[in-house]
Amino acid sequence: MVSTTGREEKQVLAAHLVRHGLKRSRQREVILDAFLKAGRHVSVEELLGIVRRRRADIGRTTIYRSLKLFKDAGLASELTYGGEARFEPLWNRDHHDHFICGSCGEIFEFKSPEIEHIQEKIARGIGFRIEAHRHHILGRCRKCAAKASRAGTRRG
C-alpha cells in the first residue's frame, strides 16, 4: 500500500533527482502528493484537475514531465488503453492485476491468490522461476458492455 504521508516516496524521488543532477521543486512535491493521495489510476487530465485545486499555476506540461520523472524513479507505472494513458503509484504497493476496459480505458484492480498459485504451479512444472509479472485483462466494463448491447439492439 502507498504510504499515507508519502515520506518514503519523496525520499526515493529526492535520491533519483540527486543521481540525475536534477533539482527539487515545490511543484513536483505538490504533484507527487496529489498523485499518491488520488488512490487510483489517474490520467494526466484527472491529475491536473486535482493539482489545480491547490496550485492553479501548475500546467499540463509540468504534470506530463513529473509523471515521466516518477516513472523513471520507479514510483509510477503507465497503462495506456482506450486511447488514454493512466498512471498508478508503484512504490510499496501490494501486488495486483488489472481488468481494463478497451472501450473507455477504465481500470479495475483485483487480487487473486488462486491465479497466483496456478501460475506458480505451471512455472514450477516447466522449471521456470517467476521474477515479476503483470496481468492486464482486456474487455468491456459494465457501462460499455451495456452501451454496446443497446446499440446492437437498435440496429437489429
Regions found by a protein language model. Name each.
Residues K37-S43:
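Short capping segments at the starts of secondary-structure elements
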